């Protein structure tokens, strides 16, 4: 089974050799590497050219003007010839048996995609306190998960994704303007409605956090980053529903079911709203990714914070009636 590996690169020359060599070192050797340099201004072209000279039968370089991740994915997919297409960020690294493991799944099941999580490393390849991208255990019916949670994010990043080519042909090309970043989300959400997706409970790669990538945690997000994230969720939701119309899928994704989105919107308004408090509380109590203990904890925390909005509202009301 031939695997096409698409690597989108923009100014990651310092990490690129590690990424590409981790593919060349795979125990599954029937591969091609389509490396799309998206208008880099560092020495990425030199790095790619040198590596391609060392493995000309494996590496297909594409150099293009900057279009963002979506445009790079489009170019990479158009050049890919494998039965399965796997994605790798230019700053991440695969473990040697990663492709062999996903090939086993594709050859022994009818799933259209395979995902897995990643260990987390820093810019110097040091593992960060045994951290990983592990999330909730997901069923193969990702479409139901997405519909139930209003497209809440609970998936591995780019370097943990692989799909059968014939399925991606129904998704690509993607809109390069809307998906300049987070294009992996477009792929995950769209393919979920085209067949079963297997999520392996194994960390088969390393996800690098180094300050220059788009990694953002809820704890460290600024108000500007939160607003950008919320806008991204809204765009994603519209894109998914447009895609569902195109493929003739009956259901639509309802953003009001997305706990993360809805709770953040409420916090941003900072105003007491009984109807919204009730709605969000119900979402917390039924959230499929929380344990019973977590539901109790997050409900208490939400109500405590909402109570502050209520007190603030009461104070404001009194001050305006004096």
UniProtKB/Swiss-Prot annotation:
GO terms for molecular function: hexosyltransferase activity. It is an enzyme of class 2 (transferase). GO terms for biological process: biosynthetic process. Coiled coil: none annotated. It comes from the Bacteria. Its EC number is 2.4.-.-. Gene3D superfamilies: Spore Coat Polysaccharide Biosynthesis Protein SpsA, Chain A. InterPro entries: Glyco_trans_2-like, Nucleotide-diphossugar_trans. Keywords: Glycosyltransferase, Transferase. Belongs to the glycosyltransferase 2 family. PANTHER family: GLYCOSYLTRANSFERASE (PTHR22916), UDP-GLCNAC:BETAGAL BETA-1,3-N-ACETYLGLUCOSAMINYLTRANSFERASE-LIKE PROTEIN 1 (PTHR22916:SF3). This is Uncharacterized glycosyltransferase alr2836.
């Amino acid at each position: 089974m031939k695997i096409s590996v698409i690597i989108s690169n923009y100014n990651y020359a310092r990490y690129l050799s590690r990424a590409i060599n981790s593919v060349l070192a795979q125990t599954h050797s029937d591969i091609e590497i389509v490396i799309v340099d998206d208008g880099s201004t560092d020495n990425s072209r030199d790095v790619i050219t040198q590596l391609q000279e060392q493995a000309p039968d494996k590496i297909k370089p594409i150099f293009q003007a900057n279009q963002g991740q979506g445009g790079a994915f489009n170019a990479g997919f158009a050049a890919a010839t494998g039965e399965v297409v796997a994605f790798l960020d230019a700053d991440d690294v695969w473990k040697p048996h990663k492709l062999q493991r996903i090939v086993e799944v594709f050859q022994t099941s009818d799933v259209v995609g395979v995902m897995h999580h990643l260990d987390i490393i820093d810019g110097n390849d040091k593992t960060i306190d045994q951290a990983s991208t592990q999330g909730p255990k997901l069923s193969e019916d990702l479409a139901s998960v997405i519909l139930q949670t209003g497209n809440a994010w609970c998936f591995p990043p780019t370097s943990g994704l692989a799909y059968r080519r014939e399925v991606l042909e129904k998704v690509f090309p993607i809109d390069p303007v809307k998906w300049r970043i987070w294009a992996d989300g477009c792929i995950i959400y769209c393919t979920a409605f085209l067949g079963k997706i297997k999520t392996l409970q194994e960390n088969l790669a390393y996800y690098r956090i180094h300050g220059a990538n788009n990694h953002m945690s809820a704890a460290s997000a600024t108000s500007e980053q939160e607003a950008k994230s919320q806008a991204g969720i809204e765009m994603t939701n519209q894109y998914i529903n447009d895609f569902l119309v195109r493929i003739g899928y009956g259901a639509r994704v309802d953003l009001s079911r997305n706990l993360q989105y809805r709770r953040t919107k409420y916090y941003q308004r900072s105003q007491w709203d009984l109807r919204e408090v009730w709605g969000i509380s119900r979402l917390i109590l039924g959230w499929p990714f929380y344990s019973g203990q977590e539901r109790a904890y997050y409900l208490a925390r939400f109500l405590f914070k909402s109570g502050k909005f209520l007190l603030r509202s009461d104070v404001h009301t009194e001050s305006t009636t004096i």
